[in-house]
Amino acid sequence: MKRYLSLALAALVLTGCVPPDSVTPTPPVTIEPVTPPDVEVPPPVDTVPQPPKVQSIDWAVSVEPLVAQMVNSDEVATGSILLVDSVKNNTNGALQTAKATAALHQVLSSNKKFVLISPQQLGVAKQTLGLSEEDSFGSRSKAIGLARYVGAQYVLYSDVSGDVKSPTIEMQLMQTQTGEIIWSGNAPVQY
């Protein structure tokens, strides 16, 4: 048994010995990192959204034909006192109704059929009644009540309705004493 053991030990020792010729050392491999080429990245550009295009409404052209129809009405006496109610916006968007009211005043004042209640008189009357200058009458009955207070014989009630891109202006001329609508008309708004 000693013999087998010494033989096995000799075999292990001999297998561990390798002649120096057969093993060639390999040089260490150096890996160089690859650098990507420098690409200049432009700074991010903040794009400003374009504002919506606001179409300018020519209110004077829009109201002139309606005023001409109203003035030619047989129901209205020349020299009558008229209160022009501010134009209401009943569209699905924003409109410059103050410009519409100013254009309506301008077109009516160039026509001598009515004597207009001035914006200053209207302001004083509103202040006396406890209303602010910016208050619109909101309803026909309030407009008629204010017209009675300032001594007007007629009230012109106007509103713009429909789609804001193609609105329609409607006007109603009412007698102050009875509230009767003696003339009404409507027309598309002109851009």
UniProtKB/Swiss-Prot annotation:
Q: Please report which positions carry a covalently bound lipid of kind S-diacylglycerol cysteine.
A: 17
**Gene Ontology biological-process entries:** peptidoglycan biosynthetic process; regulation of cell shape
What are the lipidation residues for N-palmitoyl cysteine? 17
Question: Any idea where this protein resides?
Answer: Cell outer membrane
Swiss-Prot/TrEMBL keywords: Cell outer membrane, Cell shape, Lipoprotein, Membrane, Palmitate, Peptidoglycan synthesis, Signal
Signal sequence, start to end:
1-16
Cellular component per GO? periplasmic side of cell outer membrane
Per UniProt, what is the membrane topology?
Answer: Lipid-anchor
User: Does the record's keyword annotation contain Lipoprotein?
Assistant: yes
Top-rank taxon of the source lineage equals Bacteria
Q: What is its main location?
A: membrane
Q: In the UniProt record, does the keyword Iron occur?
A: no
One term of GO molecular function: enzyme regulator activity
InterPro entries, alphabetically?
Answer: LpoB, Membr_lipoprot_lipid_attach_CS
Subunit field text: Interacts with PBP1b.
Q: Tell me, what does this protein do in biology?
A: Regulator of peptidoglycan synthesis that is essential for the function of penicillin-binding protein 1B (PBP1b).
What family does the Swiss-Prot or TrEMBL record give for this protein? Belongs to the LpoB family.
Query: Which HAMAP family does this entry report, sorted A to Z?
Result: LpoB
**Family annotation (NCBIfam families):** lp
User: Which protein is depicted?
Assistant: Penicillin-binding protein activator LpoB
According to the entry, what is the taxonomic lineage of the organism?
Answer: Bacteria, Pseudomonadati, Pseudomonadota, Gammaproteobacteria, Enterobacterales
Which gene is this protein's source? lpoB
